[in-house]
From Swiss-Prot:
Organism, scientific name: Streptomyces avermitilis (strain ATCC 31267 / DSM 46492 / JCM 5070 / NBRC 14893 / NCIMB 12804 / NRRL 8165 / MA-4680)
Protein name per Swiss-Prot or TrEMBL: Ribosomal RNA large subunit methyltransferase G
Subcellular location: Cytoplasm
GO cellular component, one term: cytoplasm
Gene3D superfamilies: Vaccinia Virus protein VP39
Reaction catalysis annotation: guanosine(1835) in 23S rRNA + S-adenosyl-L-methionine = N(2)-methylguanosine(1835) in 23S rRNA + S-adenosyl-L-homocysteine + H(+)
Length: 380
């Protein structure tokens, strides 16, 4: 937990989730504070239906809790952070409505506050889903750091909701002001996106994949996953296999096709990702599968898994960090049975082999190219 966020409604001690004393990244930034200052200075009425979209760690929702906002997020971690930050502020979390991007949005929205996400696709999808609840009098304000707001960002607001302009920058943050146009004729929501995989990627070659908005590389198979699919282990005899950080689920689905007797668990902290994995699996496989939105393997019993397959992210929103990968590796070690294996795909420069040796006492290089490595660690 770092310095508190000072707002017109008070100062709030905020933390990311899960809280890690080694993590020096803040749970709020200048754009959160800028948006809250603007709401107070402009006298924006907050007595109606207030919706907060994309609140990264609950900063906006916590500061506005007295107005009983509805938060909509794609992130399990952001949702849990919001619960804990509300508790720190002495607010009963049940007084705030917490929805996911897969839930039905409110029918009427009087104030829409948008924390601009890293994914333009997710922003596009969510604005389409929220548009029916936006009316002529809805106050729409977006917020983000200058480096996060582009011409393409503004065009999405204009194309889906109405005329859009930006504020002056303050502390490298900027606001977006959108005036809803009830007569606007918008194109249909293009999400989810479905396509067939190319040849040469193992058992899933030529098969259909579903990507909901916000999933990494939603319009094509990313090169890291392509490399991983070519070097997946034979898991014959494995009872339970985990696709950890599953994204659209192609890795776990490939395992299900080659080892139909194995139960595959798909895990991701993104609700959009797990929905994508569920559809990808059901379109291609007939085996047994479980789908879990959560913080890695924290909800999985110890010593209950035979193989974990992992392509860990190394970004948290705009920040680069290895905290997520380390948490995934430690969670995998706890969940694996003795003799169980963790297989990891990663960029060469990230040095995951050192982390695996430190944690498991071993690390084997299975495959590599100029950009990626596939590593294997065995739980003793």
């Amino acid at each position: 937990m770092n310095d508190p966020m000072t707002t017109p409604w008070g100062a709030y001690a905020l933390a990311r989730f899960p809280e890690d004393p080694r993590d020096r990244l803040r749970a709020w930034d200048a754009s959160d504070a800028y948006l809250l200052r603007h709401l107070a200075a402009s006298g924006t009425p907050l007595s109606g239906s207030v919706v907060v979209l994309g609140d990264r760690w609950g900063a906006l929702t916590t500061a506005l809790a007295a107005h009983r906002p509805t938060q909509i997020t794609d992130s399990f971690l952001a949702r849990e952070a919001t619960r804990e930050n509300l508790g720190r502020a002495g607010v009963d979390p049940s007084s705030v409505r917490l929805l996911t991007t897969r839930d039905t949005p409110p029918e009427r929205i009087d104030v829409l506050l948008v924390r601009v996400p890293k994914s333009l696709a997710l922003l596009e999808d969510q604005l389409h889903r929220l548009a029916p609840g936006v009316h002529e009098g809805t106050v729409v304000v977006g917020a983000g750091m200058v480096k996060e707001i582009h011409t393409s960002t503004l065009k999405l607001f204009e194309r889906i909701l109405g005329p859009t302009r930006t504020s002056l920058a303050e502390q490298k943050a900027r606001l977006i002001f959108c005036t809803p146009d009830p007569g606007l004729v918008r194109d249909p929501n293009p999400w989810p996106y479905r396509y067939r995989l190319p040849d040469g990627v193992g058992p899933l070659s030529g098969r259909p994949v579903t990507n909901h908005a916000g999933v990494f590389c939603a319009d094509r198979l990313d090169i890291g996953t392509r490399f991983f699919l070519r070097h997946l282990p034979r898991v014959s005899g494995a009872e339970r296999v985990v696709d950890l950080g599953c994204g659209n689920g192609v890795v776990g689905t490939a395992v299900a096709l080659t080892e139909p007797e194995a139960e595959v668990l798909f895990v991701d902290e993104s609700y959009q990702a797990v929905a994508s994995a569920r559809e990808t699996f059901r379109a291609n496989a007939d085996g047994t599968a479980e789908f879990l939105v959560g913080d890695g393997l924290s909800g999985v019993p110890a010593a209950s898994v035979d193989v974990v397959l992992n392509n860990p992210p190394f970004h948290s929103h705009q920040a680069t960090t290895d905290a997520t990968a380390w948490r995934m590796f430690t969670g995998a070690k706890r969940a694996l049975r003795p003799g169980g294996e963790l297989w990891v795909i990663g960029n060469r420069h990230l040095g995951y082999h050192l982390k695996l040796r430190r944690l498991f006492g071993n690390s084997e290089l299975v495959a590599s190219d100029a950009k990626f490595v596939v590593l294997r660690a065995v739980k003793k």
